[in-house]
């Protein structure tokens, strides 16, 4: 049944939390179904964010073409709307060459925005309101700002990690400007599929203990492979207050480099935040997406 769906699909997406086995499955399917892989991770678009985002290496690609990796400077902003436009263009290009586009990543909203009729309007910006929120953040801290959003828009707050202060503040800003919550604005979007697609999911059938152990071991391996040095390179360039360094792995080690915590404390936070994010990802995939979950390592 799954093989028939794969053969009929115009586009395949593979979603799953970190350390769930997406890379191995994507390479297997690309080889079997004449596919090319499109990055579906919102942070792997940045140059220099390689180890912390678990970006695939040339060796791991095994000759399979990969697209939309490492094409933006760390200081650049990149929205879901930007991603949607680029990926739809890339899908058309891959299909024109009679190959199968395979989107791979953990950013569920980004994948949905491509596959369904999500429409994005030009968002208003009020610099004074934004600065006021950042001033409030400096005084009260991330948790207090997230609690404020939770009181006003619990649905949106649930989807945003408290440490992702850029998104928390943007959600508060949208509420102030329009009076409409981000969640409510999105409710009537994204219901009509634009492609005959199949979304495969990993991690759902893995026990929480196994997944968390894989995540902890992956963090240890990242540190062995030079994650601290990678983050230090960004920190020394004084890259701050931008989207890229909100990624898990970067903000925790920035705290260490800023002298706010020990290295051990930063690594513990990195592991904890990675586990929490994996839990939120799985909840999102289950509740917000029509995902066909498969076993990690299952032959398709």
From Swiss-Prot:
Membership in a protein family: Belongs to the IPP transferase family.
Name of this chain's protein: tRNA dimethylallyltransferase
Keywords, sorted A to Z: ATP-binding, Magnesium, Nucleotide-binding, Transferase, tRNA processing
InterPro entries according to UniProt: Dimethylallyltransferase, IPT, P-loop_NTPase
Source organism of this protein record: Lysinibacillus sphaericus (strain C3-41)
GO molecular function: ATP binding; tRNA dimethylallyltransferase activity
One GO term of the biological process aspect: tRNA modification
Residues covered by region (Interaction with substrate tRNA): 41-44
Purpose of the protein: Catalyzes the transfer of a dimethylallyl group onto the adenine at position 37 in tRNAs that read codons beginning with uridine, leading to the formation of N6-(dimethylallyl)adenosine (i(6)A).
Subunit architecture: Monomer.
Residues annotated as site: Interaction with substrate tRNA: 107, 130
Keyword Secreted among record annotations: no
Catalytic activity: adenosine(37) in tRNA + dimethylallyl diphosphate = N(6)-dimethylallyladenosine(37) in tRNA + diphosphate
EC number of the protein: 2.5.1.75
Residues noted as binding ATP in the record, renumbered to the chain: 16-23
Binding site for substrate: 18-23
């Amino acid at each position: 049944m799954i093989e028939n769906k794969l053969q009929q699909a115009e586009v395949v997406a593979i979603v799953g939390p970190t350390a769930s086995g997406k890379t191995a499955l994507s390479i297997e399917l690309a080889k079997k179904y004449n596919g090319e892989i499109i990055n579906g991770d919102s942070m792997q678009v940045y140059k220099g964010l390689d180890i912390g985002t678990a970006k695939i290496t040339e060796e791991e690609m095994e000759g399979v073409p990969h697209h939309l990796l490492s094409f933006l400077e760390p200081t650049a902003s990149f929205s879901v709307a930007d991603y949607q436009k680029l990926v739809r263009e890339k899908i058309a290009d891959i299909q024109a060459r009679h190959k199968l586009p395979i989107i791979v990543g953990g950013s569920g909203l980004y994948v949905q925005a491509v596959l369904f009729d999500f429409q994005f309007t030009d968002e208003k910006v009020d610099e004074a309101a934004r600065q006021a929120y950042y001033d409030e953040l400096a005084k009260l801290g991330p948790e207090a700002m997230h609690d404020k959003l939770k009181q006003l828009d619990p649905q949106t707050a649930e989807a945003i990690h408290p440490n992702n202060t850029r998104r928390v503040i943007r959600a508060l800003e949208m509420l102030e400007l329009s009076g409409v919550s981000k969640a409510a604005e999105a409710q009537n979007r994204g219901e009509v599929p634009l492609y005959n697609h199949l979304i495969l999911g990993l991690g759902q059938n893995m026990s929480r203990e196994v997944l968390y152990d894989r995540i902890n071991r992956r963090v240890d391996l990242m540190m062995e492979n030079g994650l601290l040095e990678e983050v230090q390179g960004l920190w020394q360039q004084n890259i701050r207050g931008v989207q890229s360094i909100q990624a898990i792995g970067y903000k925790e080690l920035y705290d260490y480099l800023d002298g706010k915590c020990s290295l051990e404390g930063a690594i513990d936070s990195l592991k904890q935040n990675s586990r929490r994010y994996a839990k939120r990802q799985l909840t999102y995939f289950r509740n917000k997406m029509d995902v066909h979950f498969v076993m990690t390592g299952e032959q398709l």
